C-alpha cells in the first residue's frame, strides 16, 4: 500500500500487457566511413515479456544495438514490433534541474498517471514526497528510482535499461535488484554480474558481428 499526501493509494500488482514479439530480420549495420559491419545479417525473435541481458565485450556493439532499436541510425534489414522502446536513463535538460521532480516527469512523460508512479516508487521503497523536491537535490540513487518508476509506469513499452546500478551504494543496488527481479519486458545492460544473474531469464550475446539468443542468466 502506497501513500500520496494524506491519502492511501492501493498499489495493486500492475500486470504488463499481453506478450508480443520483437522481430529482427537481416539486420546489417556499419558506421558511415567504416568498411567493417558491426552487425551482419542478424536475425532473431524475442518475446516482450522476457527479461534479457545484453552481453558482449566493451566496444562490440551493445550501445549501438540499443540505438538501432531506438531508431537513431539507418540500417539494412528490419526491426518489427507493436511495442515502443524506451531508454534508461532518460536525459533531463539542464534548465529543468531546479524544477520539482513531478514537473520534470511531466516534461518527459506528459501522459503520466500519478498513482502508477507512486506505486512503482513504493516498490522501490521510496516515499512519493520525493516528487515534490527539486530534481537537482536528489541523490543519484533517488534519480535512478524516479526514472525506473516513470518507465515501468508506462504501457505498451519495452525498456532498454543501461547500467542502472552505476554509482549506487550497496543498499540502493539491492533495492534496484529486487525491483527488477519482479519485473519483465526489458533488455538490461550491466557490468554487475550479480544483477544479471538475479534479474534476467534470457541472454542476447554479441559475438563478432552476430547476436545469439539463449535461455538462462549470465552464469548459465
Q: Language-model segments: what does each one mean?
A:
Residues 2-5:
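Residue-identity detector for glycine
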Residues 8, 12-219:
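ABC ATP-binding cassette signature C-motif
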